[in-house]
């Protein structure tokens, strides 16, 4: 039964990872028609749902990679102490996974903050446009005020820099923890075989 559990986990992880291979441009037309049919065209809720849907594969990939590095002994000892699944998950696993949560949050924030294609296609009114779209329409039809455009660009970039600097430690540790754990596993396997 343990083999089936592992195969099921691998299947669902691969299923969500396939979302990383699908380009967003290939889904623009169906998304546009779906948003109109659902009454979500030109709404921030519709745009947020699209960002969440396209951000899930990356988030699941980062989080599942990190969860695999957490020693099972921690969870098993919590179960032996009488802790249930949800208590173990919320009090042990989530605090350990803070670097991965920070990494996923920063990655998805940066993607959503700088996204242009969906915002241009799925919004029409000025009140629902994102900052990259506002920058795109910042220039007038016959003249361009480059000084104002560059100032607006700097103002749009500043929040991304602040978020990255604030969570830089978590991003670096979240990205490197999985690689360190995997390399330790590969190093320890030959020594086990030699014994």
Placement of each model-derived feature along the sequence:
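Short, small-residue-biased leader/transition segments that mark boundaries at the very start
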Residues: 2-4, 186-192
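A structural signal for multi-pass alpha-helical bundles of membrane permease subunits
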Residues: 1, 5-181
